[in-house]
Amino acid sequence: MASTFLNNVNEKNAALKQQILRLCISDVDYTIADFSRELECSIPTITKLVSELIEDGFIKDLGKAGFSSGRRPSIYGLNPAAGYIVGVDVRRRHLSIAVTDFKGQVVDYQSDIAFQLVGTSDSFKGLCDYLLEHIQKLGLDKEEVLAYGINLTGRVNHNTGYSYSYFIGEDKPIATVMEQQLSAPVFIENDSRAMCYGEYIAGCGARVDNMVFVNVSWGLGMGIVINRKLLYGKSGFSGEIGHFPMLDNDIICQCGKVGCLETGASGSAVHREFIKKLKEGKASILSEKFRSGAEITLDDIINALADEDMLAIECVERVGNILGRAIAGLINIFNPDLVVVGGRMASSKDYLLLPIKSAINKHSLNMVSKDTSVEMSKLGKKAGPIGACLLSRSSLLGLM
């Protein structure tokens, strides 16, 4: 279905069809006259192309517009029944799945499903088997699934389908291997970039042209939208803010270097600082659990914020201040409409957001930052799997 209008039409018409679909993806319904005006193309040409898109199943006539007297024009939008997209956010110990219709509406969402990710073919075969079982439980046929989007941490090349953090050394890209198992197109993406796209299309990034999404989880990542387009960079690896050499410390990052921003501004930094303070004898509602020898998790620390635990607040605020300085630099460079803070640490809410904003006020250029909003993610932990669905739809239609 993805190639229906990409192959059998001339290049100009294919480009116009893509632009029509791009407008529809913004979740706004259009009349023929609206399309004509936006694309600066004649009404007869637009009428013909919209008719072909309806025939292909991508677009639907949604009825007549408005309540004015006289002949009312038809309005058009994406056809939800064109098929389904499955988006998967894969973590080391769990995964989350969203299923959307073609319009991007979520029809199913499940999170924190137990799964052990290792870089082997058996691990990814197990993931494929689970996904096939999952869609069967939802009552969907394999043929109804138009594409799968798979989010992975680390370095991912969206165009080639390779992951450079998992499945290393195999002669085929992960995407190709999974396509053979799932019998549908598979698009892999870096988790932060997918979260960024999900927030941009379906969250608080809607209606802005330039956005930076900062994923503060165990590690630190970033997605960037410039002039309404997701930024990939030359090799597809843009957004590695966690490895910006900003800090003067001796902490060895997971990448093997020292001084990386991630070592001072991430969930792992909060956890490391919290455990260090407990060892020094600082008081916390988690002190007894620590003394018993039980594991203190990052979620334990985040949950302690709700009880106004001073040590947890101190550690989160420290990270927020460091992160805010880095975001101030990003604002000075990109001058975005919006900065969104998401990921696991976003559930810290104002304990993280307020020190970020304070540091931005101190370290950014006021003339640059005064028009930039800084907000917490609207989609929360759904941003990843929803972003995977929306990115896969755009990739399927040749819009990326």
Language-model features: where?
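Glycine-rich phosphate-binding loop and adjoining helix at the ATP-binding site
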Residues: 110-210, 351-362
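Short glycine-aspartate micro-motif
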Residues: 85-89, 145-149, 211-215, 221-223
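Hydrophobic beta-strand positions
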Residues: 99, 155-156, 224
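ATP-binding/phosphotransfer module of carbohydrate and carboxylate kinases, centering on a glycine-rich
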Residues: 1-62, 68-70, 75-111, 118-143, ...
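Short glycine-rich anion-binding loops that position phosphate/pyrophosphate groups of nucleotides
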Residues: 153-155, 218-219, 345
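Conserved phosphate-binding catalytic cores of ATP/NTP-utilizing and phosphoryl-transfer enzymes
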Residues: 61-85, 188-211
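Glycine/GP-enriched mid-protein hinge/lid loop-to-helix segment characteristic of carbohydrate kinases
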Residues: 6, 109-111, 119-123, 177, ...
